[in-house]
Amino acid sequence: MSSTALLPPNTDQVLSRRLHGKAAEKKTGLAAIASKDVDEQSRKLQEYFEFWDRNHENESEEDRARRIDGYKSVVNSYYDLATDLYEYGWSQSFHFSRFYKGEAFAQSIARHEHYLAYRMGIKPGSRVLDVGCGVGGPAREITEFTGCNLVGLNNNDYQISRCNNYAVKRNLDKKQVFVKGDFMHMPFEDNTFDYVYAIEATVHAPSLEGVYGEIFRVLKPGGVFGVYEWVMSDDYDSSIPKHREIAYNIEVGDGIPQMVRKCDAVEAIKKVGFNLLEEDDLTDHDNPDLPWYYPLTGDITKCQNIWDVFTVFRTSRLGKLVTRYSVQFLEKIGVAAKGTSKVGDTLAIAQKGLIEGGETHLFTPMFLMIAKKPETDA
């Protein structure tokens, strides 16, 4: 397969090129932020933050409904703004993982991806779909780990450009294709893929039943779907102010229309026709000394090697100040759009919600579900 067979020119792509320029090909992190079109960046900032009020107590049902209806704009604007900071502060794999003593951050991230592929039973040469593939970190790891042929689906042009660039650098461009598309209306024929997976991506859907239904449709009969889902626990109660504050901080900080509970995810996957083979909240097996959220705490004493210090430092109070002042300097000299530092502030809101959600066990980013499409239609 060739990664050059992408999509015809369209408005989103033109705007993406105007905003990001050649950043997708050559730059990462703060250098990528500095290379963006200032006017277009300002427009994206305004577009994203019009969906949110910083105070969850001011949120209305109409606000939530507007985010759900405008999910494509919410998610696209979010990742146009946050992708570079994710790569700078985390990795090319935009997800969490569990940690074992002595295990480096990068090894933990890769093991988490391998574990999903292993539990799904992905075989060499099979056709696999990655739903919401980000910049392709998990896709590259799973392609190399299993020997599969992979299609990555993403609705963000900037991230697709980065996927293609990285695939070429890793000599995977013959094994991977990245396609622009809405996962609520996938641009694939029925019964196309042997396996479909999603890693912390379908949480951005306005309806889990909707996105799971599309996954069911494009899977071949007997095909397997594996997902790490972001969900609130079944103890979550939106009428409790602290519970709602935690969920809202996760939503506003991560571009999520609306968080749901574990039971809602299970109901959705069964309702579209899947046979649910396995469900397991992997945070239940967490190392209490190294919880999944420890890199967000900025506690470098928990780092398992010297290289992890750099990752964890960026989430510390001092690390966030360094990033904020660096971005504010770029704003001051006119290289970055005014308000760009607000993106970092938004990620800090998410950081607070994720840590509190982890500490209270009200939230998990790794609710594993493995499901199978029946061999024949019911």
UniProtKB/Swiss-Prot annotation:
It catalyses: zymosterol + S-adenosyl-L-methionine = fecosterol + S-adenosyl-L-homocysteine + H(+); lanosterol + S-adenosyl-L-methionine = eburicol + S-adenosyl-L-homocysteine + H(+). Pfam families: Methyltransf_11, Sterol_MT_C. In Aspergillus, the biosynthesis pathway of the sterol precursors leading to the prevalent sterol ergosterol differs from yeast. The ringsystem of lanosterol in S.cerevisiae is firstly demethylised in three enzymatic steps leading to the intermediate zymosterol and secondly a methyl group is added to zymosterol by the sterol 24-C-methyltransferase to form fecosterol. In Aspergillus, lanosterol is firstly transmethylated by the sterol 24-C-methyltransferase leading to the intermediate eburicol and secondly demethylated in three steps to form fecosterol. The lineage of its organism: Eukaryota, Fungi, Dikarya, Ascomycota, Taphrinomycotina. Induction: Expression is anaerobically up-regulated via the sterol regulatory element binding protein sre1. GO terms for molecular function: sterol 24-C-methyltransferase activity. Sterol 24-C-methyltransferase; part of the third module of ergosterol biosynthesis pathway that includes by the late steps of the pathway. The third module or late pathway involves the ergosterol synthesis itself through consecutive reactions that mainly occur in the endoplasmic reticulum (ER) membrane. Firstly, the squalene synthase erg9 catalyzes the condensation of 2 farnesyl pyrophosphate moieties to form squalene, which is the precursor of all steroids. This is Sterol 24-C-methyltransferase erg6. Its EC number is 2.1.1.-, 2.1.1.41. It is an enzyme of class 2 (transferase). GO terms for biological process: ergosterol biosynthetic process; methylation. It is found in: Nucleus; Endoplasmic reticulum. SUPFAM superfamilies: S-adenosyl-L-methionine-dependent methyltransferases (SSF53335). GO terms for cellular component: endoplasmic reticulum; nucleus. Disruption phenotype: Abolishes the production of ergosterol and leads to abnormal cellular morphology. Leads to susceptibility to cycloheximide and to staurosporine, but does not affect tolerance to nystatin and to amphotericin B. Belongs to the class I-like SAM-binding methyltransferase superfamily. Erg6/SMT family. Keywords: Endoplasmic reticulum, Lipid biosynthesis, Lipid metabolism, Methyltransferase, Nucleus, S-adenosyl-L-methionine, Steroid biosynthesis, Steroid metabolism, Sterol biosynthesis, Sterol metabolism, Transferase. Pathway: Steroid metabolism; ergosterol biosynthesis. The keyword Signal does not apply.
